[in-house]
Amino acid sequence: MQKKIETVQTLLEALPFIKEFRGKTVVIKYGGSAQETPQLKEKFAEDILLMYLVGIKPVIVHGGGRQINEMLDALKIESKFIEGQRVTSKEVMRIVEMVLSGEINKEIVSLLNSHGAKAIGISGKDAHFISAKAKDFSRWGLTGNITDVKADVISNLIAEKFIPVIAPIAAGGEMGHPGFNINADLCASYVAKAIGAHKIIFLTDTAGVLNNSKELFSTLTKAEVEALKADGTIHGGMVPKVDACLEAIEGGVAKAHIIDGRIEHSMLLELFTSAGVGTQITI
């Protein structure tokens, strides 16, 4: 009986948050271990389905760097990085699109649909809903910066009760252009801004933003993030994550969250509990 009472208490604790977020759009950047470990994939699908069933409108943007590297290695195609960004030749771009749009995207869609969701997979090339230009073609090739997002493409899918699953590939301007490889974190931020999302959540392989004693910051403002970047507390791979958060909140998204995707049901813990489990960033 006690266990049943505790279950009800858990549901009651979540109720105010369900009321608050019902009808709101939440963009999720899906990557890291959560995207690669079979058990975590299942938990992710369960979380998305629960969010969907209580009236939240999830939009998923996924990465796939490890899988791209594995395919390039298998095909013996060289791939370099400059300042942490992949140099995307035309040959590499073909593999990037094949892995992101043809393999990973379809796997996520199938996983969600097998759990009873109504997911649909697209890339930024579909309906040219994400346009981009070269970041610096002489250095990074077909690695791009987003110039435009057609929000109505996603809004129309949401209105039809679909869960959009987006591969971070953007269209080029010219006919026959091979497209652009887009950083998935920034792709998620630009999509969140364009569609007026209430929240954006980044699933990572770290607990969130940590101080120099490896303790978690539960909440940070934009000014605090900038100060922590300036003094070196935020460094390395966390810098592009917080930059993507700032991009989103500066564009009107109410809150950005960096959470540990290695924790089962971390999205539900962040959304539906008072304490949360990661770092929340606000203006």
From Swiss-Prot:
Pfam families from the entry?
AA_kinase (PF00696)
Going by the entry's taxonomy, the superkingdom of the source organism is recorded as Bacteria
Question: Which sites bind substrate?
Answer: G64, G65, R86, N181
What is the reaction catalyzed?
A: N-acetyl-L-glutamate + ATP = N-acetyl-L-glutamyl 5-phosphate + ADP
The pathway that the record names for this protein is: Amino-acid biosynthesis; L-arginine biosynthesis; N(2)-acetyl-L-ornithine from L-glutamate: step 2/4
Which GO terms fall under molecular function for this chain's record?
acetylglutamate kinase activity; ATP binding
Q: Which UniProt keywords apply?
A: Amino-acid biosynthesis, Arginine biosynthesis, ATP-binding, Cytoplasm, Kinase, Nucleotide-binding, Transferase
The record's listing under InterPro entries reads: AceGlu_kinase-like_sf, AcgluKinase_fam, ArgB, Asp/Glu/Uridylate_kinase, Glu/AcGlu_kinase, NAGK-C
Q: Which GO terms describe its cellular component?
A: cytoplasm
Instruction: Please classify the protein's predominant subcellular localization into one broad category.
Output: cytoplasm
Biological process GO terms, please?
arginine biosynthetic process via ornithine; L-arginine biosynthetic process
Q: Where in the cell is it found?
A: Cytoplasm
Is Zinc-finger given among the entry's keywords?
Answer: no
Task: Identify which top EC class this enzyme belongs to.
Answer: transferase
Q: What is its EC number?
A: 2.7.2.8
Site (Transition state stabilizer) location in chain: K29, K241
Q: Does the keyword Cytoplasm apply?
A: yes
Its family remark reads: Belongs to the acetylglutamate kinase family. ArgB subfamily.
Task: Give a short account of what the protein does.
Answer: Catalyzes the ATP-dependent phosphorylation of N-acetyl-L-glutamate.
Name of the protein in its database record: Acetylglutamate kinase
Query: Organism source for this protein?
Result: Sulfurimonas denitrificans (strain ATCC 33889 / DSM 1251)
Q: Which gene encodes it?
A: argB
